[in-house]
Amino acid sequence: LRPQDDIEMAETILRAPVRLFGALTPWRLGCWGIALVVAAPLLGVVASMGGADGATLRHLAATTLPEILANTLALAVIVALGTGILGIATAWLVTMCRFPGSRTLEWALLLPMAMPAYIIGYAYTDLLAFAGPVQTALREVFGWRRGGYWFPDIQSVGGAGTMFVLVLYPYVYLMARAAFLEQSVCVLEASRMLGARPWRSFVAVALPLARPAIAGGVALALMETLADFGTVQYFGVQTFTTAIYRTWYGMGDRAAAAQLASMLLGVVLALLIMERTSRGRARFHHTSRRYRAIRPLALSGWRAIAAILACATPVVLGFVLPVWMLVRLHAIAGDRISPSLFAS
């Protein structure tokens, strides 16, 4: 090699870490340090896999692991579709339309986020149980007898997924609404000038532009769902979180629990990779500073009623009704709140 070739090769080798990690500025080093601290528990889980002999995992694979995987994936699908539909629809309505109560619903749609999923699960289980007010009223009105009618089982995969949807859709709502507010009305007007109807403009223009934000909201909802233990435990749904707990504390096999946790991490990474792959190299940026805010469309008549119902229903089901049920249960019990609960 010529001396010039040696110099070029040395420069290439020295630039490799910069291309991989970027310029090692104090801020970047600090970010890498924080990332390592946050990732330490995950690295600990992976490191704990080394002591596993595989017997416990083989037993789980032959008995409950297929059910665990099916339930976890079913919950992920229900939550992704449910939070996506509710979050996008409500965000679009309160951003693009004005109707009676729309200003109040803008912040009221965030209230279900304050309700833990297992608490709302307690409330709905009492509401929809055989001895609950709903089934009791139906039997009194229609004269039904025990075993003579069908009623959906709230303590199931579908019921647990519904609970997650009702309390986690605000993640998608928040991020989708922020994305819709950032969009310039010029883009939507251009699509209308090209002959697109409002629905077509929403599907072909506004929704793709908001896709990164929506994907982020759905990802947050999925992370909450996959990490939840209380709700699925109460509903009797076997998922990775319940299996990890029982393997660790019930069977006393920490290494097998780490293997299950690593499988759960693999599911999460697979979901993120699928979303990133489907997006490809697409990126979304404002290419012009000619921004005009969206002028909301005033709704009246049946359209206003439909918009109110669409936006108020998640608030009622995700916050108002569970709070009412909890107050009702407290009133029936007649117990006073113990002052010891507030003792420091």
Give the residues covered by each predicted segment.
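Short, Lys/Arg-rich, polar N-terminal cytosolic tail immediately upstream
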Residues: 2-22
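Membrane-water interface segments at the C-terminal ends of transmembrane alpha-helices
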Residues: 20-53, 63-181, 209-229, 257-277, ...
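Glycine/proline-centered hinge or cleavage motifs at structural transition points of membrane proteins
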Residues: 194-195, 208
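Glycine-rich helix-loop "coupling/hinge" segments at transmembrane-helix boundaries
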Residues: 226-251
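Hydrophobic alpha-helical transmembrane segments and immediately flanking/interface helices
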Residues: 235-239, 324, 328-343
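Flexible interhelical linker loops that connect adjacent transmembrane helices
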Residues: 278-310
